[in-house]
Amino acid sequence: MNNKPTVLAVDDSPIVQQLLKNALADYYRLLVTGDAMSALSLLFQEPIAVLVLDVMMPDMDGLELCRTIRNLPQFKTLPIVMVTSKDAAFDKIQGQMAGATEYLTKPFEPEQLRQTIHRVVGSPLAEPV
């Protein structure tokens, strides 16, 4: 049985998806999708411990997805870590206003991402497999 917390990562870039897998798959149960609608579907189907979210995506961007999730009572306390190339101070404020728990900028250090997720999930990092 897998006792690792489940991380849902949402990014439309296949390259970033692979970077997220490389950084997280040994430590967490990782689900990856490239769009907001798939992410919403997975939120209702899986026990997600933390959402890792890009801002710039087609159709519904990460800020809108974050606001949508925060308006759903069952996800008001879900930790949301934005990982994005938008690095201006105003961008970070927009992320906070949308409901992000943490805001990291790309390129990210894998260890920084793991530690951020560990901090918001509140459970010890699983040993790498």
Predicted regions and their residues:
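Acidic, metal-coordinating helix/loop segments flanking the phosphotransfer/catalytic sites
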Residues: 32-50
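Receiver (REC) domain active-site loop signature in two-component systems and cognate sites
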Residues: 57
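Conserved acidic segment of CheY-like receiver
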Residues: 3-14, 20-21, 51-52
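C-terminal output helix
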Residues: 108-117
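Two-component/phosphorelay signaling modules centered on CheY-like receiver
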Residues: 14-32
